[in-house]
């Protein structure tokens, strides 16, 4: 197993200012990070309770190693040494859900180099076992799950880099059958799933990472595993990441996107009936990619934390509870080439913490909150 080592980094002793006054001196809300070794070119980090012990665990996708690093959380902010799980070529995107009905979290993984999705089943003993590989097509780049046909079994949707979305319907034993392929050009990227129009069926929202594209696509589900032709939601520009949350506390899900190339983030306010209103884009640090939403300021209002790949930082953007945000935001330097972040309460103190993977250094950093409010 990979060794665990502590790195009392100096990165968070000072909050640095970046570009054009877009950030301000940041309050000292994070403890110094603790670091864990991961594989080469860590692409994605996710936090999830994988073994039903009520403590969040961490999965890291190591794209150059053909491995996953699984860190079992101990509930006090520390983790066991990594369990290494072998994958296909160039693992790139990951989703976690129960795919075989045993109430234990499983892993669905896009192998970019193989054109496959690997289904890796979680076991009662905390280990993982490859169940099957599903051919989906050339260059799978994003994956998400939901019950698309209302049979209480998790299904999958996969985007292929240039033009398609593939739907895989779950059988219930960890295997899947290929259902439909949908045209999703140009350059479909990240997806998120929920019922966005209130009809009881799961829908898929998608961002497009093509130049000069300034809209999102929404595939409204029919409830039988098929989807209506996509509707366009105006806004964003060459977006690369998408998530959802109720940002204005009106009971309806909103969409939050980021553009790695345009250095911007966008908010789309939902009305619960499938309509979205784009709010004004807000600029930030260089290379924003994945986003975590949660209460990071202790005011019971959702905030946004963004991983800035080219900026070497994470940005904490406090929300006002009405869909607007504090500006300038707070910026924390974390190290060279942060690739992905995840948020969870890793030590059980009721405060959201952050996990960050650094691409070149091959490490996972855990930033624990040390104060509940700004």
Roles of regions detected by a PLM:
Residues 9-17:
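Bacterial N-terminal signal peptides
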Residues 20-40, 72-89, 121-138, 169-186, ...:
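Blade-edge motifs of beta-propeller repeat domains
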Residues 37-55, 60-63:
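Beta-strand-rich domains and repeat architectures in extracellular enzymes and scaffolds
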Residues 43-52, 72, 92-101, 121, ...:
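Beta-propeller blade termini
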Residues 46, 58-62, 107-110, 156-159, ...:
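Hydrophobic beta-strand segments that make up the repeating blades of beta-propeller
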Residues 54-56, 103-105, 152-154, 200-202, ...:
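Glycine-aliphatic tripeptides that mark coil-to-beta-strand junctions in extracellular
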Residues 64-66, 113-115, 162-163, 209-213, ...:
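Short glycine/acidic-enriched loop and turn motifs that connect beta-strands
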Residues 339-374:
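Blade-level signature of beta-propeller repeat domains, shared across WD40, Kelch, NHL, RCC1
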């Amino acid at each position: 197993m990979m060794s665990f080592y502590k790195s009392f980094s100096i990165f968070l002793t000072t909050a640095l200012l970046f570009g054009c006054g877009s950030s301000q001196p940041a309050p000292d809300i994070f403890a110094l990070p603790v670091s864990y070794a991961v594989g080469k070119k860590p692409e994605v980090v996710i936090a999830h309770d994988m073994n039903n012990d009520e403590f969040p665990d961490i999965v890291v996708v190591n794209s150059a190693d053909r491995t996953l690093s699984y860190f079992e959380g101990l509930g006090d902010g520390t983790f066991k040494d990594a369990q290494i799980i072998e994958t296909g070529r160039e693992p790139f995107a990951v989703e976690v859900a129960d795919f075989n009905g045993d109430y234990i979290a499983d892993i669905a993984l896009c192998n970019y180099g193989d054109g496959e999705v690997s289904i890796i089943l979680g076991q009662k003993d905390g280990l993982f076992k490859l169940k099957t590989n599903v051919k989906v097509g050339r260059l799978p780049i994003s994956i998400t799950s939901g019950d698309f046909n209302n049979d209480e079994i998790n299904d999958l949707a996969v985007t292929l880099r240039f033009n398609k979305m593939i739907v895989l319907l779950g059988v219930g034993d960890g295997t899947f059958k290929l259902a439909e392929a949908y045209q999703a050009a140009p350059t479909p990227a990240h997806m998120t799933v929920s019922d966005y129009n209130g009809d009881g069926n799961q829908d898929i929202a998608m961002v497009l990472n093509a130049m000069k594209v300034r809209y999102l696509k929404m595939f409204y589900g029919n409830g039988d595993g098929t989807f209506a032709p996509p509707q366009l939601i105006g806004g964003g520009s060459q977006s690369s990441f998408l998530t959802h949350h109720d940002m204005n506390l009106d009971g309806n899900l909103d969409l939050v996107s980021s553009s790695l190339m345009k250095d911007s983030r966008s908010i789309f306010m939902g009305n619960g009936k499938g309509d979205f209103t784009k709010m004004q884009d807000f600029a930030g640090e260089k290379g924003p990619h994945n986003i975590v939403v949660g209460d990071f300021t202790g005011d019971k209002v959702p905030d946004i934390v963004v991983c800035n790949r080219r900026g070497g930082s994470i940005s904490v953007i406090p929300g006002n509870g009405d869909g607007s945000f504090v500006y300038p935001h707070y910026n924390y330097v974390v190290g060279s080439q942060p690739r992905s972040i995840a948020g969870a309460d890793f030590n059980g103190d009721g405060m959201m913490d952050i996990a960050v993977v650094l691409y070149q250094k091959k490490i996972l950093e855990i930033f624990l909150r040390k104060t509940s409010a700004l």
